Amino acid sequence: MGGKFVRLGDVCIVGTGSGNRQDATEDGKYPFFVRSKKVLLNDNYEFDEEAILIPGEGGIGDIFHYYKGKYALHQRTYRIHPISDAINTKFLYYYMFANFKKFILMKAVSATVTSIRKPMIETFEVPIPPLEEQARIVSILDRFEALTTDLQTGLPAEIEARRQQYEYYRNKLLTFKHTA
């Protein structure tokens, strides 16, 4: 698949939040994205938008959140918010999820990357296929993601049901009556 590539900084706002981890509240109203896969809660929000959220430290290239709505953001977590109508945010999320870690590792001096900065993120190049193609790709990947999620939640329940069924039939098959 060919197409034009642009720097992320040319089509997106890249910035961080202002929150600290201790700003999290147990019963908060808004998601609070910090530098981990686990999303915390906060009573206040900083942004109301569609964005991709990645840690600036720890889990770099492994942790990606896509979010649409009101949210709070940690001071070392980056938000990537498209400002160009030429790019679908969910398409960008999938593209970054598949390619960003390799990009970061190529830029790094060592095999591990402990932190990234805004200029590094802004130089990441992304393709800009036609919006219809982006929507088609998102639709396909959304279906695969839903299927994967269903399997991850449904499979343990199915395994447990089969285990119980096995135990039932095993006990039935191995129960004998004494005859005189």
Sequence positions of predicted segments:
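Charged, alpha-helix-forming regions
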Residues: 1-180
